């Protein structure tokens, strides 16, 4: 995909700068940005940009048809389309169910010194921690299996990643039994796609200078 940099100044807001780029002075109404995806750093930045675009179009006596204005990781929602990706509540519930006290005692790489009583609160905290670790790995375009195969990783750490991969496999099976896809798997497979969704021809990174590697691979 072709890349082009645009440098903004310090005298106007980012929303005004980006709206001027998307709707230049020589553009003629009616305005349509349906084929453009704008990535913004926060939801609030997205709201300000939409307002700036609406005001700019209004000054030309028109409106503007918008494409997605989203934060970077919502790009995966576009790529996933109608795929049955599990939401965060389903993922959390299944991880909690998989991390039974009996299974946790078998995962001595992940839990070398588990508490005597692995109650709901402890298992819930452990599940959330592992979900967060997977999300951080996915941001770098990695999975636990990648670290198992990395010879530079300490063997003790490889044991931990091997345990995590084991739990991931069980979670994946449980999700599949309910007809769901693992969102991390969808992220990693989407990042490997060579082309963006056909409905969009332009992606604008507006004030997102430090995007995650997994997002960069998609663009």
Predicted features along the sequence, with ranges:
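Conserved phosphate-coordination/catalytic loops
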Residues: 8-16, 177-185, 209-210
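Short active-site oxyanion
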Residues: 34-37, 202
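Short glycine-enriched loop/turn motifs at secondary-structure junctions
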Residues: 31-32, 61
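A short acidic-Thr-Gly-centered motif at the start of a beta-strand
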Residues: 23-31, 191-198
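Conserved RecA-like helicase ATPase core segment
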Residues: 214-219
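Structural motif
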Residues: 9-11, 41-43, 203-213
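Basic/charged alpha-beta structural segments of nucleotide/phosphate-handling enzymes
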Residues: 40-48, 53-198, 213
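N- or domain-start disorder-to-order transition segments that initiate the globular core
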Residues: 1-26
């Amino acid at each position: 995909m072709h890349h082009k940099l645009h440098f903004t100044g310090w005298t106007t807001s980012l929303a005004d700068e980006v709206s001027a780029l998307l709707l230049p002075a020589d553009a003629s109404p009616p305005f349509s940005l349906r084929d453009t995806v704008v990535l913004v750093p926060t939801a609030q930045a997205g709201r300000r940009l939409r307002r700036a675009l609406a005001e700019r179009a209004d000054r030309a006596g028109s409106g503007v048809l918008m494409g997605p204005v989203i934060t970077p990781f919502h790009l995966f929602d576009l790529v996933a389309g109608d795929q049955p990706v599990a939401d965060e509540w389903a993922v959390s519930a299944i991880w909690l169910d998989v991390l039974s006290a009996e299974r946790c005692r078998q995962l001595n790489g992940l839990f070398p010194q588990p508490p005597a009583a692995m109650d709901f609160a402890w298992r819930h905290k452990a599940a959330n921690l592992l979900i967060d670790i997977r999300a951080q790995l996915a941001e770098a375009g990695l999975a636990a299996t990648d670290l198992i195969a990395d010879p530079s990783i300490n063997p003790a750490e490889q044991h931990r990643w091997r345990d995590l991969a084991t739990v991931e496999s069980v979670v994946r099976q449980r999700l599949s039994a309910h007809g769901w896809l693992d969102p991390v798997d969808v992220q990693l497979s989407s990042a490997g796609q060579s082309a963006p969704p056909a409905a969009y021809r332009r992606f604008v990174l507006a004030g997102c200078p430090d995007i995650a590697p997994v997002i960069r691979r998609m663009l």
